[in-house]
Amino acid sequence: MPDKPKSLIAGSTGLVGSLLLKDLSSGDEPIVLISRKANQFLTKNTSEIIINFDDLLSDTFDLSEEIDHVYLCLGKKLFTYELGYMPEKNRDTFKKIDFDYPLAIAKLAFQNGAKSIAIVSAIGAKEGSPNYYFHIKGKLENAIKEIGFENVCIAQPGHLL
């Protein structure tokens, strides 16, 4: 009997990720969470890897898990005005959380066997947009598409408050 498919969720303590975790946890397929802090809603089919997300950006981080599906629900909480104009001082942190970390996780998951990926992006995402927020979201979408996953699902909701 083949092993059950294993899912990885990054961002399971946020709005979208917590709802996704609740939905996936109702089944019996194994789920691995990558988190910066402990998730208080673990079930029998979930395991958790607590990390400093900056470690993802090093060449030495090893996921050590075979993955079938990956869900990227990471995102920096923003003030509404940052959707229209993001101050220079906030851009590095935003890019790290909304581009660098998700891309690193996607690449690691792909290296560990993931065939499909779903990401939470934003309506209006477009690399090259003069709006920094939409530019970074579009840049991530394009980078994810280039990795080689068999299936890519990009959700583009309006801004999540």
Language-model regions, residue ranges each:
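Short, polar loop motifs at secondary-structure junctions
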Residues: 33-40
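Catalytic loop of short-chain dehydrogenase/reductase
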Residues: 118-136
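NAD(P)H-binding glycine-rich loop region in Rossmannoid oxidoreductase-like domains
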Residues: 40, 45-104, 108-111
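N-terminal Rossmann NAD(P)H-binding glycine-rich loop of SDR-like oxidoreductase domains
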Residues: 2-27
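Short-chain dehydrogenase/reductase
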Residues: 10, 95-99, 130-138
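Conserved beta-loop-beta element that borders a ligand/cofactor-binding pocket
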Residues: 142-161
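Conserved catalytic Lys-bearing alpha helix of Rossmann-like short-chain dehydrogenase/reductases
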Residues: 31, 99-102, 136-144
